Amino acid sequence: MKTSTYTIPISKNNIRKRFILLNGKILIFLMTAITIFVLGSCAKKIVFPVSPTEPAAQGTILFKTDKNKNYAIDLTVKHLANPERLTPARKCYVVWIETAQNGVINLGQLHISKNMGGSLKTNSPYKPNTIFITAEDDPTIKEPGMYTVLRSESFNLK
C-alpha cells in the first residue's frame, strides 16, 4: 500500500514571521513578569496576628512609599463582626497608627460589609510602627478607646 506524503512548503519569509511572533510573545511575558516582581517588591505586607477579642478576624496591611515620602496604606479585613454585635455594642471601627514622632493617629473609619469584610485605603505622611483597629462610638475621636479588635506587631518600614 502506497502512502502519499504532502509537505508544506516553508518559505524564509514564513520562518521569519514565526520567529518574530515567538520573540514578541517571549518579550511580552518577560516584561509582565518583571513588572509584577518590581511592583510587588516595592510594597511591604503585614498580617495581623490572631486577636484574643475577635479570633475569627483576619487582616492584612499593604504599605507603599510614594515619591513624596508618604505612606500609602491599604488595609483589608475579613470575618470581622458588625460593631453593633460586640459586647458592649459600638457604632464603628476606627483604624489607628502608632508613630515614633507623632504618637497615635486616627486614620479613619473602617466600614464593614454584610459579608463581614472591609477595607480602608489612605495615605499618611507619618511613618507607622504599629497599626491597630478599635471599636468606637465616634469615628472622629482623637484617642483610641479600650476595645482593640486587631493589632499588628511592631514593624519597621524603610
Model regions and ranges:
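N-terminal targeting/export leaders
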Residues: K2-I10, C42-K158
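Sec-dependent bacterial lipoprotein signal peptides
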Residues: M1-C42
